[in-house]
Amino acid sequence: MAANVGSMSQYWKRFDLQQLQRELDAAATVLANRQDESEQSRKRLIEQSREFKKNTPEDLRKQVAPLLKSFQGEIDALSKRSKEAEAAFLTVYKRLIDVPDPVPALDVGQQLEIKVQRLHDIETENQKLRETLEEYNKEFAEVKNQEVTIKALKEKIREYEQTLKSQAETIALEKEQKLQNDFAEKERKLQETQMSTTSKLEEAEHKLQTLQTALEKTRTELFDLKTKYDEETTAKADEIEMIMTDLERANQRAEVAQREAETLREQLSSANHSLQLASQIQKAPDVEQAIEVLTRSSLEVELAAKEREIAQLVEDVQRLQASLTKLRENSASQISQLEQQLNAKNSTLKQLEEKLKGQADYEEVKKELNTLKSMEFAPSEGAGTQDSTKPLEVLLLEKNRSLQSENATLRISNSDLSGRCAELQIHLTEATAKAVEQKELIARLEQDLSTIQSIQRPDAEGASEQGLEKIPEPIKEATALFYGPSMSSSGTLPEGQVDSLLSIISSQRERFRTRNQELEAESRMAQHTIQALQSELDSLRADNIKLFEKIKFLQSYPGRGIGSDDTELRYSSQYEERLDPFSSFSKRERQRKYLGLSPWDKATLGMGRLILSNKTARTIGFFYTLFLHCLVFLVLYKLAWSESVERDCAATCAKKFADHLHKFHESDNGAAAGDLWQ
């Protein structure tokens, strides 16, 4: 059976009912959207068909009418089939959406199966103990000294009482100390984790601020260097352009001067040639010779001036070339320095960007911290979460889920602690009750022994009946049986083992009874826990639907987007179901049937609804019924136990007295003793 329950639990875990419900929610939402779209498309098709009938001639309409009717019939059949499929899907969806997950119940059932298996093991162990008890009884049968056995048993009972008390006290103290230590350790760990997270977050914020400041500083420096570099490069380029223009002008002037010098040289050569011709012609007049001399001297002066100007221009060109090379070298060195600085800044910027990427989750951590602060501390501190990317509705849903999980864990821990405390209390009450019962049993045995010992021994031939009136009735019956006509022995147990067997059997019976009560209490507690969780789940579902209604109201304002979360879709479908006219019609029908009931039926139904709807009323009714049953069982058990104890005590006293008579009056006459008792 445990294997079947375990396999069923594994099957339901693999089945994942919650995931199926979410998928059904999404499918229901898509189905509703498709219904709206199909309605709109159908309306458009009807309008288009009407326009077609209006705009087309009658002959064409008659020809197309059968085709349109066949199309319309097919469309109606398809729509009918889709509606039937959607109705079937919605019925399946309505039945499956509120089905609770049976995995926790199966787990509880599996645990109960394990406990039942343990109970069977305990029963087998009990059988073994009974066998050992029988062996002990056989061994105890060899003991004949009754007084020594009684004293030893009394000493053992006292030792057992002391050990039980000490064990119960030590177990209770150990459990209490262990629970306190566990709570203290958990609280300390929680505080340490909170402090460590806050310190790490502060360090991360500080590092991020320093990195941001360093990044901004490097960016400003890099921007300044780029601007300076651009300005210097533009200035150098302008200066180089000016020098180049000056150099070009100087080159042009040098070329012009060279051309003029060449022309002058040509003129000079022509003048020399003319002088040579003039020297050959000696017959020329003196005026012409003077003119030629003057012309020659003026040309020589102009040639010298041009040569000086050419030399000066060449010097200017050389000086400009030297300054240009020097300027190029300076600009190249400055450009290399600026490039080195730019590379250094770029490397620093890359390092800072890598550090920033390494701490890229700062915003997420900060957002989570603000969300936790807004949910954990005062409402005024949660104003920072309004700037986060998540909307308020998602935060509320997440908070609701976290509170549900925390409530479940606290409830489980509370149930565990209460169960442990109840077990310890039960152990303590069992120990005290067992000690009291053993004391009462010892007192009864001592009283019976004193009663038996106080009886005077009758004479062999006869005695008065005054002392015999004090003998209990069970002893008389045992003696009558002992001295009856059959003369058979009525004692089946040894002499000194009756009280020990009685105490052992009674203690064993009490142990079984308490174990059975513990198992019944655990079963009832598990059922009560399941019912409480189911009711709490229903209340949480109703609260979530109300919360979704508020979210829907908030989303109705302009500028608010509608989320597409699975949880919102599921609660949206439940909210739409609440607005369903069929459900309202069914509610009205139920109200009409309720009004048609008799007053007695109304009172009974109202009382049942009141008890089932209110948690306090359910608890009171449950405990009241449990108290009545326990009271009846306790009274019946007390009556049965008292009768059993009386019978056992009477039988014990009778057997002891019969053994005593059999031992000490064996030589007496049986007939005389029979007459005496008569």
Curated annotation (Swiss-Prot):
Give the main location. Answer: Golgi
- Indicate where the modification Phosphoserine is found in the sequence: 586
Q: Which UniProt keywords apply?
A: Coiled coil, Disulfide bond, Golgi apparatus, Membrane, Phosphoprotein, Transmembrane, Transmembrane helix, Transport
Is Membrane there in the keyword field?
yes
Subcellular compartments: Golgi apparatus membrane
Q: In which tissues is it expressed?
A: Ubiquitously expressed.
What would be one Gene Ontology cellular-component term for the protein? Answer: neuron projection
Classify the protein's membrane topology as the record does.
Single-pass type IV membrane protein
A GO biological process held by the record:
inner ear auditory receptor cell differentiation
What InterPro entries does the annotation carry? CASP_C
- The domain of life is Eukaryota
One annotated GO molecular function: DNA binding
Question: Is this entry keyworded Phosphoprotein?
Answer: yes
Lumenal side of membrane: 641-678
Listed transmembrane segments: 620-640
Pfam families given for it?
CASP_C, CUX1_N
**Function according to Swiss-Prot or TrEMBL:** May be involved in intra-Golgi retrograde transport.
> Subunit structure, per the record?
Homodimer; disulfide-linked. Interacts with GOLGA5.
UniProt lists the family membership as follows:
Belongs to the CASP family.
Identify this protein by name: Protein CASP
